[in-house]
Amino acid sequence: DQMNALVKAMDGEAGDLLLFAADRNKIVWNVLGALRVELADQMGLLDKSDYKFLWVTEFPQFEWSDEEERYVAMHHPFTMPMDEDLDMLETNPGAVRAKAYDIVLNGTEIGGGSVRIHQADVQSRMFKALGLTDEVANEKFGFLLDAFKYGVPPHAGLAYGLDRVVMLMVGADSIRDVIAFPKVKDASCL
C-alpha cells in the first residue's frame, strides 16, 4: 500500500523510475545529477554533436559548512550579492544570491565569473557575514579595504576553460585527454 501511495503521489506510471535519496542537499544533488547523466548516456539520449549552451545565474552567495558550523562563501568573499538581497546579509545569509554566473556546454561548465564587490561597506558586511571580525578582516584584507578609499568602478570578469571546450569538441571523456601535462586526482603526473 505504501509503495502504491508513493507512486500515485508522484504521478508515477508504468516504466517510470522513481528514486529517493537522503543526505545533505549538495551530496544528493551531485549523486542524482551524475546518475541522470550516466543513464542518459547509456540509453543513447545524448547527442554529443549538438551543442547546447546554458547560463547558470543567481548562485547562492553562501553555503553552510558542517565542518566549520558557519556559512562560507560559495565561490569567494569578493562576489557582489544581488542588490535586492543585501538586506539579508546579516539576517538570512542562506537566502542571499550572488551576482555570479557560469556558462555550461552540454552539461560541462566551460567558464565562470562574477561581478566583484566595489563598495567598501558591502565588502565589510560580507566579511562580517563570514564571521570575520574587523580586526581579522583588516589583518587579512586591509590592503583591499584601503584601496576602496580611492574609488573602485563596478567590474566583472569571466574565465573560460579552453581545455574543457576542446575536450567537448573532440568527444573526450576526461579533460586529462586534451591537456599537455595531465595530473591525476592527487595532483601527481600520469
Q: What role is predicted for each listed range?
A:
Residues 1-190:
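Structured aminoacyl-transfer and RNA-binding surfaces used for tRNA recognition/handling
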